[in-house]
Swiss-Prot record:
InterPro entries: BAH_dom, BAH_sf, C5-Methyltransferase, C5_MeTfrase, Chromo-like_dom_sf, Chromo/chromo_shadow_dom, Chromo_dom_subgr, Chromo_domain. It comes from Arabidopsis thaliana (Mouse-ear cress). The lineage of its organism: Eukaryota, Viridiplantae, Streptophyta, Embryophyta, Tracheophyta. It comes from the Eukaryota. Residues 225-768 form the SAM-dependent MTase C5-type domain. Residues 37-59 are annotated as: Disordered. Residues 79-199 form the BAH domain. This is Putative DNA (cytosine-5)-methyltransferase CMT1. Residues 308-333 form a coiled coil. The gene is CMT1.
Length: 791
């Protein structure tokens, strides 16, 4: 790939390679390539380098060669090559030849014949790299990379066909590729490693499928677009995303969410009663969707488009034999031990009976019994309840109980990949996808392949790029491209969007061919930190390339976010309290503490009053609480300030002559604090300070090896204080134990990052963005969270 960006070594002149025909007219040449025909006077005054592309990098600039004349054709081995023909270009020894499009033929002012190439990339030369086998054979990508090369670099002509990028629908359509050596339907652009449609005339309206489910969906919900939040946690990403979309003018609703954590699901349901919250594993959710589609086809609610293998045990033939025998409708007397189904209440794919085998299950309300007798029953045993089943499926179809292919406009989610975490000492570097902890990435991709949404936003930790040379990121992009999705990759730091927290994360956009690929929102605030990202991916940090042109607000600090919160002790029993008339001291505090009715959040969720929720710290044991009391209330204080600690050459050790004791008789300075990173860390029992920016909000609050102690109070930061560092509105109440709430907040995508991405999505989905990979935000967080009718 690097070889394309350097001038090729000039080959020896060959008699069978030359320009053909007469030179083009001076007038036409100067109109088409004015930069090649600068006068000597102009050349002395003008820049000697070609300006970088808008949003591009300085290192992309190149010396502009001056021309005597231009040609529109050349002769290579007796074969005529015209402008815009595709050619093989002499490559490196032992390697495949390069592929390029000839976009200029000219004789330089020194008499040397040149051509200008626009390069094609094979899959293995792109971000896809080692996963080129996932992409269709003969498929190449036209890049935006261009440069001048001696005419002698041309090896031969090659036949490359441009074909339309097909719609992504649930219908099986045989794609017709004309006879060719290669074909392309996408462009590959190095900034943000974009794969975009090569069809510049795409029409967003053409993205609608002919599937009956989608047609029904569009008719019923013309003004609404539905979002599925996978691995949703407590809903931070989708909450911010929908608010951002709303600011852009798009009504996006989180219609479905899926997460395996019950407490996180409870939190999401409390704040978003409009959402169908599924507390189950993503792979079970996918199995359920396939069965749901089969049921909808069975009752002629959607047309059958392609075979979906049934996972249930009930065969259609058995049901057909009993079509006329429905105990619920015949009024026949029940046999002893039989019960009559009154109605179905729910559906899942699982094993509630504990048999060891997961199957399709329905929640049954039994006739003559109350809800305490409701049970999950396997679908295979409900063959005599066809009418009740049909009624349930029809009602579920109308209410969009579960998503069907074509009914989901956007999917967002962060598939957990603990197998790549830097905290995992047993990572599988050679084959990360063989690690069960990374399997959810494949499940996520399978769900996308089944539902075929218009847009996808995938989030993950930066280790996605750092681990094993970006193995999982490359696999994800290759999979999306193989499904014919456009993709764009970037990294965004929470602090860049109005939070006193660094927290850098990877975000991957994917969009259907006929949709506009969303850009990344440029930062609004300063972040004075260099992120530890691989050199290959450093330009994926959103705003890095454009930083010198941005006017950013000052970075927020911890005090800016939490100074108005009432003081609390180590133990707080109640998770609801008043603000105690404490007035917000900063703009951030003013807007983050708005009542729900004053924000862009759905008005019918959560608590409508202005109360303070979850301002509870993790309860420290007596020993740790006493240790915290030894930490001075000053900047940079930590366990090294405890009595009996000596520091030499930035390494802490115990004073052998003095060992302070706690009231319990244990040592004030625990051994784990001294041994952590061999005594060189300052994190154990570290006290935060008001003018600081927190590195990353984590899922636990123990102070043993991290800096989480409140600046002026002898306790760790509360759940609500952590939530503010993540940008949660104060009205967003959480469910579960205090430890569970810390986990939900720590796992969340920072809300303002979601807002910024939602706005970019909304603008792109309306066709209001250009082809640039970034967009400037017209607002700041959390001011943007205020509802328009409250301004």
């Amino acid at each position: 790939m690097a070889a394309r960006n350097k001038q090729k070594k000039r080959a020896e002149p060959e008699s069978d390679l030359c320009f053909a025909g007469k030179p083009m007219s001076v007038v036409e040449s100067t109109i088409r390539w004015p930069h090649r025909y600068q006068s000597k006077k102009t050349k002395l005054q003008a820049p000697t380098k070609k300006p970088a592309n808008k949003g591009g990098k300085k290192e992309d600039e190149e010396i502009i060669k001056q021309a005597k004349c231009h040609f529109d054709k050349a002769l290579v081995d007796g074969v005529l090559i015209n402008l815009n023909d595709d050619v093989y270009v002499t490559g490196l020894p032992g390697k495949l030849k390069f592929i390029a499009k000839v976009i200029e033929l000219f004789e330089a002012d020194d008499g040397v014949p040149y051509c200008r190439f626009r390069w094609y990339y094979r899959p293995e030369d792109t971000l896809i790299e080692r996963f080129s086998h996932l992409v269709q054979p003969k498929r190449v990508f036209l890049s935006n990379d261009e440069n001048d090369n001696p005419l002698t670099c041309i090896w031969s002509k090659v036949n490359i066909a441009k074909v339309p990028l097909p719609k992504i629908t649930s219908r099986i359509e045989q794609r017709v590729i004309p006879p060719c050596d290669y074909y392309y339907d996408m462009k590959y652009e190095v900034p943000y490693l974009n794969f975009t449609s090569a069809d510049d005339g795409s029409d967003a309206s053409s993205s609608l499928s002919s599937d009956s489910a989608l047609n029904c969906f569009e008719n019923l919900h013309k003004d609404e677009k539905f979002l599925l939040d996978l691995y949703s946690g407590c809903g931070a990403m989708s909450t911010g995303f929908c608010m951002g979309a709303s600011i852009s003018g798009v009504k996006l609703i989180t219609k479905w969410s899926v997460d395996i954590n019950k407490f996180a699901c409870d939190s999401l349901k409390l704040n978003h009663p409009e959402t169908e919250v599924r507390n189950e594993a993503a792979e079970d959710f996918l199995a359920l969707l396939k069965e749901w589609k089969r049921l909808c086809e069975k009752f002629s609610l959607v047309s059958s488009t392609e075979p979906v293998e049934s996972i249930s045990e009930l065969e259609d033939e058995e049901v057909e034999e009993n079509d006329d025998i429905d105990e619920a409708s015949t009024g026949a007397e029940l046999e002893p031990g039989e019960f009559e189904v009154e109605k179905f209440l729910g559906i899942m794919f699982g094993d509630p009976q504990g048999t060891g085998e997961k199957t399709l299950q329905l929640m049954v309300r039994w006739k003559g019994y109350n809800s305490s007798y409701d049970t999950w029953e396997p679908y295979s045993g409900l063959g005599n309840c066809k009418e009740k089943l049909k009624e349930y499926v029809i009602d579920g179809f109308k209410s969009h109980l579960l998503p069907l292919p074509g009914t989901v406009y956007t999917v967002c989610g962060g598939p957990p990949c603990q197998g790549i975490s830097g905290y995992n000492r047993y990572r599988n570097n050679e084959a990360p996808l063989e690690d069960q902890k990374n399997q959810q990435l494949l499940v996520f991709l399978d769900i996308i392949d089944f539902l075929k949404p218009n847009y996808v936003l995938m989030e993950n930790v930066v280790d996605l790029l750092r681990f094993s040379k970006g193995f999982l990121a490359r696999h994800a992009v290759a999979s999306f491209v193989a499904m014919n999705y456009q993709t764009r990759l970037g990294m965004m730091a929470a602090g860049s969007y109005g939070l006193p927290q660094l927290r850098n994360r990877v975000f991957l956009w994917a969009a259907q061919p006929s949709e506009k690929l969303p850009p990344y929102p440029l930062p609004t605030h300063e972040v004075a930190k260099k992120f530890n990202t691989p050199k290959e991916f450093k330009d994926l940090q959103v705003g890095r390339i454009q930083m010198e042109f941005l006017k950013l607000d000052n970075a927020l600090t911890l005090a800016d976010a939490i100074s108005d919160l009432p003081p609390v002790t180590n133990y707080v029993a109640n998770d609801v309290m008043d603000y105690n008339d404490a007035a917000p001291k900063t703009e951030f505090e003013n807007f983050i503490s708005l009542k729900r009715s004053e924000t862009l959040l759905p008005a019918f969720g959560g608590d409508p009053t202005r109360r303070l929720f979850d301002h509870q710290p993790l309860v420290l044991g007596d020993d740790d609480l006493e240790r915290v009391s030894y930490i001075p209330k000053q900047k940079g204080a930590n366990y090294r300030d405890m009595p009996g600690v000596l520091v030499h050459n930035n390494k802490a050790e115990i004073n052998p002559r003095f060992r302070a004791k706690l009231k319990s008789g244990k040592n004030v300075v625990p051994a784990y604090a001294i041994s952590f990173i061999k005594g060189k860390s300052k994190k154990p029992f570290g006290r935060l300070w008001g003018d600081e920016i927190v590195n990353t909000v984590v899922t636990r609050a123990e102070p043993h090896n991290q800096c989480v102690i409140h600046p002026m109070q002898n306790r760790v930061l509360s759940v609500r204080e952590n939530a503010r560092l993540q940008g949660f509105p104060d009205c967003y109440k959480l469910c579960g134990t205090i430890k569970e709430k810390y986990i939900q907040v720590g796992n969340a995508v920072a809300v303002p990052v979601g807002v910024a991405l939602g706005y970019a999505f909304g603008m792109a989905s309306q066709g209001l963005t250009d082809d640039e990979p970034v967009i400037k935000l017209p607002f700041k967080y959390p001011e943007c969270m205020q509802a328009k009718d409250q301004i």
